[in-house]
Design a protein with these regions (language model features):
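Small-residue-biased structural context
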Residues: 2-162
Length: 162
């Protein structure tokens, strides 16, 4: 369904959807690591992995909210459409990440599990909407700007460059 990120391909040959979907996978890896460590009650390790996950997700949100979404809204004229829905979901996920992080800090496995389950479902649904609806719309509307936007996104998402 989605293609894999190839850092040897020139950046201009990678579309927005593929680039941002690969960043979703990059973030997801840290969430999966958190889950494994929390299940083993390795609270320090889980908290560290979750902190990295949260940092990467917040960088991803920032790249979307400060660069990608405004460019899409300007070009498409849609300001209260899919980008507003995504911003609202970002707000909800920030709250869930705060709650999950607090549960890890308290070493409360039950509370963490509840927060993490809700967060996981929300992240999966959110990513599907972005990857199957919003990012293809961005590729369509921002095609002529992709050669400028993709390097800027890469700069904002440093984990993607490696």
């Amino acid at each position: 369904m989605g293609s894999t990120f190839n850092c040897h391909r020139p950046l201009f040959m990678i579309n927005i959807r593929d680039f941002m979907a690969q960043d979703h996978l990059h973030c997801d890896g840290f969430f999966q690591q958190t889950e494994r460590l929390a299940a083993a009650q390795n609270w320090a390790g889980a908290a560290a992995a979750f902190a990295q996950f949260k940092t990467l997700v917040l960088q991803h949100f920032d790249a979307e909210e400060t660069l990608l979404f405004p460019a899409f809204e300007e070009k498409s004229g849609m300001r209260m459409g899919p980008t507003q829905v995504m911003r609202d979901e970002h707000t909800q996920m920030r709250q869930l990440m705060d709650a999950a992080g607090a549960a890890l800090d308290e070493k409360d496995g039950g509370d963490y599990a509840g927060c993490a389950e809700t967060l996981l479902i929300m992240v999966q649904q959110h990513n599907l909407k972005e990857e199957n609806v919003l990012y293809p719309m961005c590729d369509q509307h921002l095609f002529d700007q992709a050669i400028v936007l993709l390097p800027q996104l890469q700069e904002l998402l440093p984990g993607k460059a490696t």
